[in-house]
Amino acid sequence: MRWMDAPRALAVLALLLLGACNKRDGLSSRDAAALTGGDPHAGREKIREYGCDACHTIPGVPGADALVGPPLAGIGGRMYIAGILTNTPDHMVQWILDPPALDSATAMPNVGVTEEDARDIAAYLYTLTSGREPPR
């Protein structure tokens, strides 16, 4: 696990606090990239590549309207990931990398996502709002 330096930790805290003030709005692509170290535009493509759209409804991803897993609109504004992890960028990346390692009872499989791709996917997810298209 990577540890954040103090300035980055403060930036993450500030962004999370801003998100807590207005849970309906996702982050801008630039803020999401700074928060996660990933590329939200690449993350949108990786979501399809890894088949996330087969189980989840994901705004901005054509055809991602499945109802097996929870809908991901507004996930960046939720307090918890999968009901067990506080919603932080590092936890989001860890969850995307290997869900069963964090919750053996989860139905979400480990699909072999690389750390770089997990950061990109996390960046995209943090741009999602509560139902509207993500920022471009």
Specify the residue positions occupied by each region the protein language model found.
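Short cysteine clusters
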Residues: C52-C55
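Bacterial N-terminal signal peptides that target proteins for export
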Residues: M1-L10
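Short, non-ligating residues that shape and space the ligands of small metal-coordination modules
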Residues: L27, V61-P62
